[in-house]
Amino acid sequence: MTDNLPEIEEKEHRMRSASYHNPDRLLRHVSSMHRALTDTQVCVAVRVRPLNTREIEAQSNKCTELLGPGTLKITTAGQDPKTFHLDAVVHEDAPQEAIFHLTAKHIITKIFEGYNGTIFAYGQTGSGKTYSMIGGDETSEEGVIPRTCRRIFDTIAKDTEKTYLVKAQMVEIYKEKLKDLLAPEGFDLRAEEGSKWNGKLLIRHDKSKGGKGIYITGIREKIVTNTKDVLDLVQSATDKRVVGETNMNSESSRSHLVLSLTISCQHVTDVEGYTRTVSKLHMVDLAGSERAKATGATGARLKEGAAINKSLAALGKY
């Protein structure tokens, strides 16, 4: 005698759901996924968000189902279900801590080994990118950026044999133009750089050995010595960031926000002598992709949306 197939599937679904409602079990699950991703150069993780107030009031149905650690099924009305296989899929009940462990922890390890790294949140407008990256006011709601900064400075504090210098820069990309979010309002850097500089922030690529790599001319950097220093800069930058209301999000980010940390490490030993490594970590809160029909955008909002989609399309070229 064999079990009924639908009953088996229902049992498996309940077991998966139970694991996400048990914090300890969920973190063990995330830890196992983290170990599997440690040696992966590019990791794609999907975070499923719960229904928002607007969707609940409209009595919308959930369209996602987790079939396994890296498998997601999406069901759209009138269409056949589609299954996607990714590096990791995180349930809507997963806490912010789990997102950090999965997406940032292994990158921080590599940063201290001399590698560069990037963490960015991509998704439709209103999908929770800013919440995932920056988070809320409570400690338990802290996003990837504050948790990553705290881990970096905790690691530095414990490593007493090396000397570290950490610098931060923050840039906003709004309608395809760069803005230095660490520069005071109305500040003109031309006075410092000399009359030959036209005041524009430009992206450059230094391909020379030991060179800067990709960098921005004219942007300000600030030395940061602890997590609070960075979070104060993030808060100040967030206050300057362009946001606006659409039908899909009352506080829609209309620009991309890039926080870059440059971590320099000096080490002197009797055997190897003097060594110096420089690593860069970029953490990006992208503006959300959007359809004008869904957002109801017109005028300036419509132009912003077109610029957002144009820059996001560049991700598919690399």
What are these model-derived regions, one by one?
Residues 2-318:
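Microtubule-binding structural modules
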